[in-house]
Design a protein with these regions (language model features):
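Extracellular/lumenal glycoprotein segments
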Residues: 2-217
Length: 217
C-alpha cells in the first residue's frame, strides 16, 4: 500500500470512531484570535472528524493558535485565508529566518508560495559595515561571526572575506525579497481539500459522511 493510502485509511478509522458529542462548529483559542473551521480542526475543542488529516491546530499556554508540522516545532498561526487556501505563520521565538533554513513541509498538506535560492554566509563581524543593507540572523552566530542569508544572485555583493556556509532553496512569501530577514511571516498554501468554490459562495465545507473523504459544499 502507498503511504498516502495508509494515511487516508487511518483517518477514515478516526472518522468512524470519533465521538458524536463534539459538533463541528467554528472555534478559536479565545479573544480576537484566528477563526478555525474545516479543513482545520482545533484540539481539544474539536474532534478529529471535524477536519482533514494534517490540518490539526492547537492552543498555546498564551491562548495563541499554533500549527505543528511534521519534524518541526510549532509555528504560531497569524491568519487563515480560507478562500485563497493560505495560512500565515510566524515563529514564536521571533527568529523565522533560522526556522526557514531547515524548513521541510514535505510530509504535510502545505507547500510554500515560492521557493528561492538563498546563500547562507558566515562573516566576521568587523568586516560588515554598519551601513550594509544586509542584516545578520540575530539568533545565529557568536561573538566574532554573524550569519547572513541573501538571494544567491546577490551573494557576490557580500564582503569577499565571508565564507559560504550553504546554498539552498528556501520558502518565502515574496520572490523579490533580498534578505531572508525581510520575511516576518511565512505564507503556506494547500491544494487539497479544495473548498475554494464553497468559501467564495459563503457556504460551509466538510465531509459528506463519516465513511468517505469526499467533500461537500
Amino acid at each position: 500500500f502507498s503511504k498516502q493510502f495508509l494515511v487516508h485509511l487511518i483517518f477514515i478509522f478516526h472518522l468512524l470512531n470519533a465521538p458524536e458529542a463534539k459538533r463541528c462548529y467554528s472555534s478559536s483559542c479565545g479573544g480576537r484570535n484566528v477563526n478555525v473551521r474545516f479543513p482545520f480542526w482545533l484540539f481539544p475543542k474539536h474532534s478529529s472528524s471535524c477536519g482533514h488529516a494534517g490540518f490539526n491546530l492547537l492552543c498555546t499556554d498564551r491562548h495563541e493558535t499554533a500549527l505543528k508540522l511534521p519534524n518541526s516545532k510549532p509555528f504560531l498561526v497569524r491568519e487563515i485565508d480560507y478562500e485563497k487556501q493560505r495560512i500565515r505563520l510566524n515563529d514564536p521565538n521571533n527568529c523565522l529566518a533560522k526556522r526557514l533554513v531547515s524548513f521541510d513541509a514535505s510530509e504535510s498538506p502545505f507547500s510554500p508560495l515560492h521557493l528561492v535560492n538563498y546563500t547562507i554566509l558566515s562573516c566576521h563581524k568587523e568586516d560588515i559595515k554598519p551601513s550594509s543593507p544586509y542584516k545578520p540572523i540575530h539568533c545565529l552566530g557568536n561573538s566574532t561571526s554573524s550569519f547572513f542569508a541573501t538571494r544567491s544572485d546577490l551573494a557576490s555583493s557580500m564582503p569577499s572575506s565571508c565564507q559560504i556556509f550553504k546554498t539552498l532553496l528556501l520558502p518565502v512569501s515574496s520572490p523579490l525579497s533580498v534578505d531572508l530577514n525581510d520575511q516576518e511571516d511565512l505564507w503556506l498554501k494547500w491544494d487539497s481539500p479544495n473548498c475554494r468554490d464553497c468559501e467564495s459562495n459563503r457556504s460551509l465545507c466538510g465531509f459528506k459522511d463519516k465513511t468517505t473523504l469526499e467533500i461537500k459544499w
